[in-house]
């Protein structure tokens, strides 16, 4: 399993290349389509992402692409699964697996990310569809009092549990603890929260025996 994870990491981290986030949810991509007068149907989304992934030379600059679950199951006009369209260009297919955020109970203003239930079984399907890495995003609202320790600990534990499940299934995890930058706090407060959040995340990763060499950290 470690050799599989190492091969994926090396492919994702090709020098001079980056990761493309193409994992917009249906509501998000609907807003973008509406701005250019396009109705957001499943066929329109399939055609758009097919065009994107088949762009000649894309693999010269992009080493991995994060896909939405819908996209992973779609095919190009010639019947080729879109994950394979990406792979043929040397682009590693990945998938966003979290189910979004909700309010954290007994923690006003804080949020927690959902999606751990049944994750291992979902990975079994995603791997057959070509996914080799995954992404999970935790969101931290910032103010003079936020995030609270409960939110930092709960989200860190969820990120670590997700990462451990990923590695157990041969999937490289992208761990994304996003400290939001749209509040009215100053940069010093943002730095303070970021340090605390990353500390909690890496303590949790260690508790869950996540191999750091086989994961990617995506900070804000």
Predicted segment positions?
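Alpha/beta catalytic barrel-like cores
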Residues: 1-129, 142
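Conserved, mostly hydrophobic/aromatic
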Residues: 20, 41, 136, 175, ...
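Generic secondary-structure signature for well-ordered alpha-helical cores
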Residues: 38, 50-60, 164, 168, ...
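Proline-centered loop/turn at the N-terminus of a beta-strand
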Residues: 92, 172, 214-216
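Domain-level signal for soluble alpha/beta catalytic cores
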Residues: 102, 192-193, 217
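Helix-rich catalytic cores of soluble enzyme domains
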Residues: 119-204
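Catalytic alpha/beta core domains of metabolic enzymes, predominantly
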Residues: 208-220
